[in-house]
Amino acid sequence: MKFCFVEDHRADYPVRVLCAALAVSPSGFYAWRSRPESVRTVENRTLLEQIRQVHADSGGRYGSPRVHAALQSRSIRVGRSRVERLMRCHGVRALVARPRRVNTTDSCHPFPIAPNLLQRQFTATAPNRIWLADITYLPTGEGWLYLAAVMDLHTRKIVGWSMRDHLRAEGALAALQMAVQRQKPGPGLIQHSDRGVQYACGDYVAALEKAGIMPSMSRRGNCLDNAPMESFFHTLKTELVHHRHYGTHDQARRDVFAYIEGFYNRKRLHSALGYRTPQEIELRAA
């Protein structure tokens, strides 16, 4: 596998430098290179091209589990360990996150707190039974931009979202209104959120009541009570935001729109869905 790495990078660095870094000899590399290719080597080269295509199609976001699932969906039968080994050997890696934390929850307010109806039971038998709502932040050259989002727990689809340059309730309300207009939910829907003022204030509670939605709220300081929503925000930042430098709010809005509507909801393989897409799950449930 070390010789594979040397072969992949010899156009960029001298072979002797690469061999020294990997503690192998140049003569050993050239002897390896001059051998007739085995059937396995030819298969690996074809497979690597397919892996790189899947990885590129995901915008560099997929690691080996999702690459493997995507290959399986294309009727390419291969073991997950083989995919992982080829990706590691040839430097095909998923994007990684940069840790940073900004508090978007203000739970010091006089509004009533709804009970926690979920109790971390993150399962729903059909779409529009349980929604999750939360707010996160995006850095831009014009200051913070705040993304309010609503997720359907069954499909993991982002059914509503809104972006504002402030943390007032309008952003959360706009995301809820988009979700209601888009999904047209029936009775019995629960929406779970943190206990922030945006979700506990009178305007938001009135909007829930008008739509026939029951509110549910996390315990104080328990982000795991809304874990799937936290996971989506982590994914968004790992796969997109942490690899961008937005000069303006509009740049961030366009990029996030393309990610949510063009990639995440329609194309991204989701581990909690058995490596299927939110759109696929929604269509099956229709």
Where are these regions (language model features)?
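Charged DNA-binding/catalytic regions of mobile-element recombinases
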Residues: 1-286
